[in-house]
């Protein structure tokens, strides 16, 4: 594994003088569950009040934009137009933006893909109206699937932080 979370884990281990054992999960919800249940000592998460019930967070170390993706021919042109009756929004199950949109969307229907990396594939296969996700992932997905466009702006900012079980 590689990336900022892996680098931070190794730096934390050095600072504490302990060996780091990395455990990789394929979905954020599984990682949250492992830390909440003390099956892992530290995790790297998007800060969310629901997750905060079982996890204590550090100050955020990065901000990530949540964005929407639609088909090029979609009549939806702005984030404010997404929350309409009959609109189906595909999200990654248990992701930070799933938790946020579950609270924020009042009229649209949320459909949960198994993981965040599968959101756009499910959105395309199921012919849903909107895909929600991390901007960088959605930008990558527009290169894999033609005929898609990102809506301008963002619907949320995700604060990424280290977290440990509340019980500690």
Regions found by a protein language model. Give the residues of each.
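Extracytoplasmic small-molecule ligand-binding "clamshell" domains
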Residues: 1-46, 51
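Flexible hinge/capping segments at coil-to-helix
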Residues: 59-61, 70-89
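Short loop->beta-strand "edge-of-pocket" segments that line small-molecule binding or catalytic clefts
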Residues: 1-2, 80-97, 108-110
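Hydrophobic residues within well-ordered alpha-helices
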Residues: 12, 35-36, 82, 122-124, ...
């Amino acid at each position: 594994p590689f990336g900022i979370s892996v680098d931070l884990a190794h730096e934390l281990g050095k600072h504490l003088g302990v060996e780091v054992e990395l455990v990789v999960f394929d979905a954020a919800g599984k990682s949250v569950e492992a830390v909440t249940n003390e099956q892992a000592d530290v995790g790297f998460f998007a800060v969310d009040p629901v997750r905060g019930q079982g996890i204590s967070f550090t100050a955020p170390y990065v901000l990530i934009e949540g964005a929407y993706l639609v088909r090029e021919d979609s009549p939806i042109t702005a984030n404010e137009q997404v929350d309409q009756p009959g609109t189906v929004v595909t999200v990654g199950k248990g992701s930070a933006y799933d938790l946020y949109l579950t609270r924020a969307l009042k009229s649209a229907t949320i459909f949960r893909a198994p993981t965040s990396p599968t959101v756009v594939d499910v959105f395309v296969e199921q012919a849903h109206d909107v895909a929600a996700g991390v901007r960088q992932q959605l930008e990558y997905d527009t290169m894999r699937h033609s005929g898609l466009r990102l809506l301008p702006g963002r619907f949320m900012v995700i604060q990424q932080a280290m977290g440990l079980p509340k019980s500690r």
